[in-house]
Amino acid sequence: MYPNGLFGLDALRVLISPIAIFGIIFFILYLRNDHIRAGRAVLLLLAIGVFALLGAKLFSLHVRGWEVYEPLSSELRGGLRYPGALLGMILVGPLLKRWILPDLPLPRFLDVLAITVCFCFALVRFSCFMNGCCTGPECDAIYCLSYEPGSQVWYVQLQQGLLDHSSHPSNPVFPLHILFMAASLGVGVFLMWFDTKRSFNGQIGLLFLILHDGAKAILESFRVPYVGELQLTSLSISAAGLVALIIVLYYRRVNSA
């Protein structure tokens, strides 16, 4: 899916290990005052990462109608979708935490995991920038990017008959992946700041669902080719987070009255 990229690198496979290491270090340092067991935290995050990748791959296959890339090795180069990764973490993460790191309260775990995910996905978006995926419509402004043959945007334009020859690079496209990156980074910075002002453990996790997936849902409107299931899933997750936050705030207000 991403054979060449902007600098001739398969950036996803190059960056996945450094991103994982960054996420583990960030998570442990963020909770250093909670005196968590670092070894168990590493094991927990690695296990969650496996299920996140599995969820991202399954969601990608679902969106593609369960069609596998040819050759099969191309599946290792990409074909991952964020909503599947998030759903995998939400469904399996609490259970894994209970088994591996039971001393850390679940709501606090979800708060810090949410902040960690923001920064990790901002780094993942750099691989999108390198490889030419998650782009917007064609444009001719100075900030628009053209990608080498073999990139996702090149494949799409070739299939649509927009390129004169298969040896030509893609037509310039809007760098939507940079906005995705900025959204993840911005939400992460805000959540770190708000974490010091939170009213209860778990609030940051709910705000993450609302803000991060809400922003992603808006940006999905400009993706080319547009994938409705990606936008609908992000909207649903954001709405579910908003409903959950309203319910929690209501019950907290009732109980404090």
Regions found by a protein language model. Name each.
Residues 1-257:
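Hydrophobic, membrane-interfacing alpha helices
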